[in-house]
């Protein structure tokens, strides 16, 4: 049974909008959750407990934040919209374990904030209804920094979530799948209808769970170069990797035979398309490329 303090209801959200004269900014992708059942599903999937520190991005009016505060040891929330800070100060006033930072998550010193506010937590989870227009940059920024994050349970546009969780050979499988699955084990939690948001977004949503691997799926000496090589295989999805790499490498057209030799020595048929290659296949290509100095980009 809901208590009257839950923010994630249409009536409470409307009351807060009226109280603060708040208007949604489309440019910030603001869609507030108004269904506590969805929030409870997110909390359950997160496996957070009294020793967990949580990073939240885009808390809005605090509908998810208050539930996180009830379950976690500490919550560190980043909110870019200055107009929401007094709202959050109001709605989260009963909780002394929440810190709200009024900064752009892509510009904030997250590592320093975690060290300052979550240092006594046994594990750290990212739990958020992410701004859909910058979901990918946010996740990659967090994954590629030296921050001790154990996992992510995040809401995002369904199409993007399916790409993160895509299997080899599927239409959704691409370079984003490779980067995210390199760092994490991915799974789908639930699909979320538009009706549980205010205002309703134009796209369907999904909650995905990404648990940090103790070691990356493959070992490479330069992650950035590895990801660039993998991304090039998807430049034109209908083309073979042979064609895509001819376009990717400097003077690739003049090195057709070298590219074929490189692919074959890595055990990869040049006629295959990028979506048929596993992360392990791309790691073989990356290592084998070191034997071919002609292949520059």
From Swiss-Prot:
SUPFAM superfamilies linked? S-adenosyl-L-methionine-dependent methyltransferases
Q: Does the keyword Methyltransferase apply?
A: yes
Under catalytic activity, the entry for this protein gives: adenosine(1518)/adenosine(1519) in 16S rRNA + 4 S-adenosyl-L-methionine = N(6)-dimethyladenosine(1518)/N(6)-dimethyladenosine(1519) in 16S rRNA + 4 S-adenosyl-L-homocysteine + 4 H(+)
Give the Enzyme Commission number: 2.1.1.182
Question: Which class of enzymes does this protein belong to?
Answer: transferase
User: What subcellular locations does the record give?
Assistant: Cytoplasm
Q: Which coarse location class describes where this protein primarily resides?
A: cytoplasm
What cellular component GO annotations does this protein have?
A: cytosol
Q: Name one GO molecular function term.
A: 16S rRNA (adenine(1518)-N(6)/adenine(1519)-N(6))-dimethyltransferase activity
Q: Which residues form the signal peptide?
A: none
What are the alphabetically sorted keywords of the record? Answer: Cytoplasm, Methyltransferase, RNA-binding, rRNA processing, S-adenosyl-L-methionine, Transferase
Xref: InterPro entries: KsgA/Erm, rRNA_Ade_diMease-like_C, rRNA_Ade_Mease_Trfase_CS, rRNA_Ade_methylase_Trfase_N, rRNA_adenine_dimethylase, SAM-dependent_MTases_sf
- Name the domain of life this protein comes from: Bacteria
Cite the binding residues for S-adenosyl-L-methionine. Answer: 31, 33, 58, 79, 104, 129
Its biological purpose is as follows: Specifically dimethylates two adjacent adenosines (A1518 and A1519) in the loop of a conserved hairpin near the 3'-end of 16S rRNA in the 30S particle. May play a critical role in biogenesis of 30S subunits.
Q: Which family does it belong to?
A: Belongs to the class I-like SAM-binding methyltransferase superfamily. rRNA adenine N(6)-methyltransferase family. RsmA subfamily.
- Name recorded for this polypeptide: Ribosomal RNA small subunit methyltransferase A
Encoded by which gene?
rsmA
